[in-house]
Amino acid sequence: MSTIEEQLKALREETLTSLKQITAGNEKEMQDLRVSVLGKKGSLTEILKGMKDVSAEMRPIIGKHVNEARDVLTAAFEETAKLLEEKKVAAQLASESIDVTLPGRPVATGHRHVLTQTSEEIEDIFIGMGYQVVDGFEVEQDYYNFERMNLPKDHPARDMQDTFYITEEILLRTHTSPVQARAMDAHDFSKGPLKMISPGRVFRRDTDDATHSHQFHQIEGLVVGKNISMADLQGTLQLIVQKMFGEERQIRLRPSYFPFTEPSVEVDVSCFKCGGEGCNVCKKTGWIEIMGAGMVHPRVLEMSGIDATVYSGFAFGLGQERVAMLRYGINDIRGFYQGDVRFSEQFK
């Protein structure tokens, strides 16, 4: 065996032994070894320099051994690199393994705002009574907001201090009644009565304090058909109050005045804290004012082209904030709008 063959054998055995000793995470050590063996200035290149001393007859044989050694070592380096990568991935997977039997981490979830809860609950009550829910414009025409509600241009209730005007004829609605006017215009009474509620945000030029806000939410109801009477209104109000505040609640109607209804009434509910005995909530009266109502004024019907001698109707309106404050004992309306999570989380 020539000296070159011995050197090749020794280099091969030494390199293979060194590769077996390289562990995962030591890829640089393997790369350095590869350069030192197979690189341009590596051990194999140094051995090849001895080819000049080999006879012409032996050069093909020695060259074959050199190529075999190069192929074996190259394959060994590639196999080692593959094994190191597999070990690296396996170690990484082991460190990141998930125990599927462990309980999951709870996801922080939100909840509906108390006003949304109140609105949806009230809407569900009316839907169950056969009413339709109708939305409308918050930016409204003066004509629909006032004139169609029997509030002519010179009516004192149209004081500028009560309304946000955008132009002389465009304003932010002060109630959701314009939705009812448009609904009466569009309804085909030959197919039956109109039964609807119109929930939504309204705007008044009030100074914000514990009981007043420049914006709040109303739900107004309207029923128009043949032979609709005050008795129908009273029965409807009684049912609404009982569903919202409890079966034991009673109502009391007091005469009042609204331009768009005649007769008009204020609706009181028996105090749900003291049961009518008198307390701070009801101001010692046993009753709590809850909403306004009345029979639709004939002029309001006629402005929609409805024959007031054939058709009649009733209307009512209540504030969602008012209902929520009474039900949950909230004494400051501003809490609904300040975005305080501590306040909102009480009503999950």
From Swiss-Prot:
Chain sites annotated for binding Mg(2+): E262
Single GO biological process annotation from the record: phenylalanyl-tRNA aminoacylation
EC assignment: 6.1.1.20
InterPro entries xref list: aa-tRNA-synth_II, aa-tRNA-synth_II/BPL/LPL, Phe-tRNA-synth_IIc_asu, Phe-tRNA_ligase_II_N, Phe_tRNA_ligase_alpha1_bac, Phenylalanyl-tRNA_Synthase, tRNA-bd_arm
Intracellular or extracellular location(s): Cytoplasm
Top-rank lineage group of the source organism: Bacteria
Reaction equation(s) it catalyzes: tRNA(Phe) + L-phenylalanine + ATP = L-phenylalanyl-tRNA(Phe) + AMP + diphosphate + H(+)
CC cofactor: Mg(2+)
GO molecular function: ATP binding; catalytic activity, acting on a protein; magnesium ion binding; phenylalanine-tRNA ligase activity; transferase activity; tRNA binding
Presence of the UniProt keyword ATP-binding in the record: yes
Free-text remark on how the cofactor is bound: Binds 2 magnesium ions per tetramer.
Annotated keywords: Aminoacyl-tRNA synthetase, ATP-binding, Cytoplasm, Ligase, Magnesium, Metal-binding, Nucleotide-binding, Protein biosynthesis
GO CC annotation terms, alphabetical: cytoplasm
Family: Belongs to the class-II aminoacyl-tRNA synthetase family. Phe-tRNA synthetase alpha subunit type 1 subfamily.
Subunit structure: Tetramer of two alpha and two beta subunits.
Listed NCBIfam families: pheS
Protein's name according to its UniProt entry: Phenylalanine--tRNA ligase alpha subunit
Source organism per UniProt: Streptococcus pneumoniae serotype 2 (strain D39 / NCTC 7466)
Phylogenetic lineage: Bacteria, Bacillati, Bacillota, Bacilli, Lactobacillales
